């Protein structure tokens, strides 16, 4: 499975994503330590620090946490959009034969976890807002675990996990756009649409300076922030207008250059900061009722059981119907281990959770982050153990 060009594009991301996964673990551990230390109030003060930006009459005032979730994550989704466009033009999504297998797996990996969550929470209208939380996959974390197995991991398995996560990202983008949009403020939406039109015109005029696109995209981000449509979507939309190829410099790609420049920033700065700001749960006053509440239980079981069950069952049906087939060097045992790793929702699940629930309101009843961390932790452990047992080569001792 996969051409040489496709393998090269995947390996270009593997090293940074693997290290990024380790950084995410460290950022999460640091947040939990700070949130449960005698100086836990310093952590709370930090993420709730008010930050205000003014441009003449325009004012944007938010706590630091929301600047991270709405601002920094827009940069992350911009990178996701760039990766999607590149994959569509010349990567793993450019050939139909390479699309069907991960697309079917990703569909199952979103549908079944969501159904498990709904089975726990269908009677609670507030809890229902979290149905999409276990549908996400954190590719950086998953690749970080996969990297622990070294050269034993076949290339086709890395490509399958990466492309499956790409489809997961597409699903997350659509879910955010359709289900987590607040009341619409029409003037803001119209300005955002005008920015999209200008971006289209600039692209058609063959403008290659990425700073022009980013300037217009920044205005679009502000407009979407005010419009009620989640501002992170501005990053994805902006990426679609970045030129793939350069007419002035044949062989150069403005999109690839920008993607290369942003990869390290997203992996080593944006995602660790997001994880640190969103995973600091104070466990000192949490009772067992918080762990057994239907929301965290639905999330944890959706990630731990629903993800691998959904991916494997949908892939099996797809293979039986001859819609697709497994790569020759993979078997159902290794694919099961990979499917368990896909249950590491972490940063993406935390992000969807921040859209679904307001901790100031629901925090006294349940904390969805408990389910995300538990489900992701057990999924990572299960995936590692399964792959360590089924992959050829020397087995790693725990």
Curated annotation (Swiss-Prot):
Point out the gene that encodes the protein. Answer: nhaA
Source organism superkingdom: Bacteria
Q: Give the species.
A: Desulfotalea psychrophila (strain LSv54 / DSM 12343)
Q: Name one Pfam family in it.
A: Na_H_antiport_1
List GO terms (cellular component aspect).
plasma membrane
Protein's GO biological process:
regulation of pH
Can you name this protein? Na(+)/H(+) antiporter NhaA
Which family is it part of?
Belongs to the NhaA Na(+)/H(+) (TC 2.A.33) antiporter family.
Question: Which PANTHER family does this one have?
Answer: NA(+)_H(+) ANTIPORTER NHAA (PTHR30341:SF0), SODIUM ION/PROTON ANTIPORTER NHAA-RELATED (PTHR30341)
| Record membrane topology | Multi-pass membrane protein
